[in-house]
Amino acid sequence: MPKASEVKKNTAIEFNNNVYLIRDIERSVPQGRSGGSLYRMRMYDVATGSKLDHTFKADEMINLADLSRHEVSFSYIDGDEYVFMDIADYTPYHFNKDSIADEILFINEETQGLQVLTVDGTPVAIELPANVELVIVETDPSIKGASASARTKPAILSTGLSVQVPEYIANGEKIKINTAEHKFMSRADSK
């Protein structure tokens, strides 16, 4: 059993006789109090989808649930459901559009390194790779010779995600995006 300070995002835990998936963790250090840090965790019940915010002390022990990961690829959209296919055994995993709204902004047919997290065989979340490559569909014209400048401009990508990019980037270019920070990393390697 890990301590609360050792638990990471997208971990499944058992809490109050239910299984929750941790979606966000905020660390705080109370002023004027002896003791350690506090970890406020935003969790979602795997069975019902209901949200729970709970604060744990850093040294509080947490029970982990049986969580497994399956490498998948995005397959197709069926109404409000997004369907992902297991790369190893072709098992389809269905997700409601609302339950993966944040992840959808980084996913297209070419996205590699996606994983479905399952608890007791039930899909509960999509885990994104550290970075993805997406195409810019709308941005201001590029400025020649602006590579030495640190100024940025907004760009809309093929999935609808909006990020800040350097001024020398143009429409139609494929770029790498950091999925955790929602930030431009570099131009994608041309193959």
From Swiss-Prot:
One of its GO terms (molecular function) is translation elongation factor activity. SMART domains: EFP, Elong-fact-P_C. One of its GO terms (biological process) is peptide biosynthetic process. Pfam families: EFP, EFP_N, Elong-fact-P_C. InterPro entries: Elong-fact-P_C, NA-bd_OB-fold, Rib_uL2_dom2, Transl_elong_fac_P/YeiP, Transl_elong_KOW-like, Transl_elong_p-like_YeiP, Transl_elong_P/YeiP_cen, Transl_elong_P/YeiP_CS. CDD domains: S1_EF-P_repeat_1, S1_EF-P_repeat_2. This is Elongation factor P-like protein. It comes from Shewanella sediminis (strain HAW-EB3).
